[in-house]
Amino acid sequence: MGILSVDLLITLQILPVFFSNCLFLALYDSVILLKHVVLLLSRSKSTRGEWRRMLTSEGMRCIWKSFLLDAYKQVKLGEDAPNSSVVHVSNPEGSNNHGHGTQEKTVDGAECHLLDFANPERPLVVNFGSATUPPFTSQLPAFSKLVEEFSSVADFLLVYIDEAHPSDGWAVPGDSSLSFEVKKHQNQEDRCAAAHQLLERFSLPPQCRVVADRMDNNANVAYGVAFERVCIVQRQKIAYLGGKGPFYYNLQEVRRWLEKNFSKRUKKT
């Protein structure tokens, strides 16, 4: 099958889910607009502030790009884990570890690779996301709990990627305590600074290492993240591959995988 035929087939596969996502956002906008009008008529103070639509031309481009990233991702369940190039981000709660039981001081922006954090004897849970992705940030407390409960048998890595909803791009309503105002990253320093902003709001356990994707977004592309995704690497292979976010981003599946494979060992420790 030729390249054009493959691209056409992928496009035809993406179109139905792309339009269903657009329909969901249109319904969401309608509900929010109706709520906004009701509050306005009641002269409620809650109406103060800008109302932002989710279904915009910028939003549609981002959604389409996310499906393309998922369709062309390198990562496959059971196959070799892509060893993407990333940079260190210091976790204020502790030092970055290289392998279980050892700690090294690292400098922000120091180059490394994703599999540098993998131990052949332990699974590595890799969580991809950004501060401006509400489904990702809302699950960070649950992710922190996973780290605390399973750090005796597994390693954890948070990979900070390109912003899902930058304030100067496809922004989301900022009426939540979980919301962040972060612009598009212009350089690696911007991305590391955004990661630090996230860590200041959500303190991760010291057992969780933190890195940032390079500005070429090679980790994002290889793992088909777009918004958020979680996977588990074991012996350099993909042992678990989570679904495409936001709708199929599921930390409960990660918990079940860890409990199934390591619950007995956790009880002994």
From Swiss-Prot:
The record describes its membrane topology as:
Single-pass type III membrane protein
This one is known as Type II iodothyronine deiodinase
UniProt-listed PROSITE patterns: T4_DEIODINASE
Q: What main location does UniProt list? A: endoplasmic reticulum
Can you supply one Gene Ontology CC term for this chain's record?
A: endoplasmic reticulum membrane
How the protein assembles, per its UniProt entry? Predominantly monomer. Can form homodimers but homodimerization is not essential for enzyme activity. Interacts with USP20 and USP33. Interacts with MARCHF6.
BP GO annotations = hormone biosynthetic process; thyroid hormone catabolic process; thyroid hormone metabolic process
Catalyzed reactions: 3,3',5-triiodo-L-thyronine + iodide + A + H(+) = L-thyroxine + AH2; 3,3'-diiodo-L-thyronine + iodide + A + H(+) = 3,3',5'-triiodo-L-thyronine + AH2; 3'-iodo-L-thyronine + iodide + A + H(+) = 3',5'-diiodo-L-thyronine + AH2; 3,3'-diiodothyronamine + iodide + A + H(+) = 3,3',5'-triiodothyronamine + AH2
Per its UniProt record, what Pfam families does this chain match? T4_deiodinase (PF00837)
Q: What class of enzyme is it?
A: oxidoreductase
Alphabetically sorted, this entry's keywords are: Endoplasmic reticulum, Membrane, Oxidoreductase, Selenocysteine, Thyroid hormones biosynthesis, Transmembrane, Transmembrane helix, Ubl conjugation
Segments on the Lumenal side according to the record's topology features: 1-9
Please explain the role this protein plays, according to its UniProt record: Plays a crucial role in the metabolism of thyroid hormones (TH) and has specific roles in TH activation and inactivation by deiodination.Catalyzes the deiodination of L-thyroxine (T4) to 3,5,3'-triiodothyronine (T3) and 3,3',5'-triiodothyronine (rT3) to 3,3'-diiodothyronine (3,3'-T2) via outer-ring deiodination (ORD). Catalyzes the deiodination of 3',5'-diiodothyronine (3',5'-T2) to 3'-monoiodothyronine (3'-T1) via ORD. Catalyzes the phenolic ring deiodinations of 3,3',5'-triiodothyronamine and 3',5'- diiodothyronamine.
Modifications made to the protein after synthesis: Ubiquitinated by MARCHF6, leading to its degradation by the proteasome. Deubiquitinated by USP20 and USP33.
What is this protein's gene name? Answer: DIO2
Q: Report the sequence similarity comment from the record.
A: Belongs to the iodothyronine deiodinase family.
Transmembrane parts of this sequence: 10-34
Q: Where is the active site?
A: U133
Quote the tissue specificity entry.
Answer: More expressed in pituitary than in brain, low to undetectable levels in thyroid and skeletal muscle.
State its location(s). Endoplasmic reticulum membrane
Q: Which GO terms describe its molecular function?
A: thyroxine 5'-deiodinase activity
* Record EC number: 1.21.99.4
Cytoplasmic-side segments: 35-269
